[in-house]
C-alpha cells in the first residue's frame, strides 16, 4: 500500500518496479516542495552544471574571409584578451565548438564552410560576424556572394557592423555564453 491509497501488486516485472519507484519519488519530491524546499531532479542539476562549464570554455575556430577577420584578431590580442573568458582559438574544426564566420562568403567558399562545419563535434555553435556574413553586406547584389552565411550553416549569434568592433564580437561571445547557460539547444538566432 502506498500513502495515497493506490495499491500495486508485487511482481518481478521491471515495469511494476519502475511504476512503484516513480510513485515513491513523486511523493518524496512533493513532500519537500510542500515544506518550501527548492527541489530539482539530479539530471537537471547535472545538465545545468554541464551547460555552465561548457559556456566557460568556448573554443572557436576562425573562418576569416575579409576585413572582419582583423577585428576578430584584435579580440584575441592583449587589449581584449578572450582567454580570461575561457575562449581559446583553435586551428582545427575537430577541436572547436564555435565557428566565427567573419567576412564576405562567396559561392565558391560556401561548400568549404559547410564541410568545416560538419567536421565540428557536437554541440557546435556559429557566430556570424559583420554585415557581409550576416546578409551579404556591401556586396549583397553581386552574383558571386552568398547573401548570409545562415543559408549554408545554422547561425546562433549575429554580430552587426561593417566591420564590427572587437567589443561587439566580445559582446556576441558573451551572449552565446548566456544562451548556452539558458540551455536553448534548438533555438537559433538569439
From Swiss-Prot:
Cofactor(s), by name: [4Fe-4S] cluster
The keyword Transcription regulation is annotated on this UniProt entry: no
GO CC terms, sorted: plasma membrane; respiratory chain complex I
GO terms, molecular function: 4 iron, 4 sulfur cluster binding; iron ion binding; NADH dehydrogenase (ubiquinone) activity; NADH:ubiquinone reductase (non-electrogenic) activity; quinone binding
Documented EC number(s): 7.1.1.-
UniProt keyword annotations, A-Z: 4Fe-4S, Cell inner membrane, Cell membrane, Iron, Iron-sulfur, Membrane, Metal-binding, NAD, Quinone, Translocase, Transport, Ubiquinone
Pfam families: Oxidored_q6
Cofactor note: Binds 1 [4Fe-4S] cluster.
EC category: translocase
Catalytic activity: a quinone + NADH + 5 H(+)(in) = a quinol + NAD(+) + 4 H(+)(out)
Annotated membrane topology: Peripheral membrane protein
PROSITE patterns: COMPLEX1_20K
InterPro entries from the UniProt entry: NADH_UbQ_OxRdtase-like_20kDa, NADH_UQ_OxRdtase_20Kd_su
Keyword flag NAD: yes
Regions that span the bilayer: none
SUPFAM superfamilies: HydA/Nqo6-like
Gene3D superfamilies per the UniProt record, alphabetical: 3.40.50.12280
Compartmental location: Cell inner membrane
Highest taxon of source: Bacteria
Subunit text: NDH-1 is composed of 14 different subunits. Subunits NuoB, C, D, E, F, and G constitute the peripheral sector of the complex.
NCBIfam families: nuoB_fam, PRK06411.1
Function: NDH-1 shuttles electrons from NADH, via FMN and iron-sulfur (Fe-S) centers, to quinones in the respiratory chain. The immediate electron acceptor for the enzyme in this species is believed to be ubiquinone. Couples the redox reaction to proton translocation (for every two electrons transferred, four hydrogen ions are translocated across the cytoplasmic membrane), and thus conserves the redox energy in a proton gradient.
Family: Belongs to the complex I 20 kDa subunit family.
Entry-linked PANTHER family: NADH DEHYDROGENASE, NADH DEHYDROGENASE [UBIQUINONE] IRON-SULFUR PROTEIN 7, MITOCHONDRIAL
Name of protein: NADH-quinone oxidoreductase subunit B
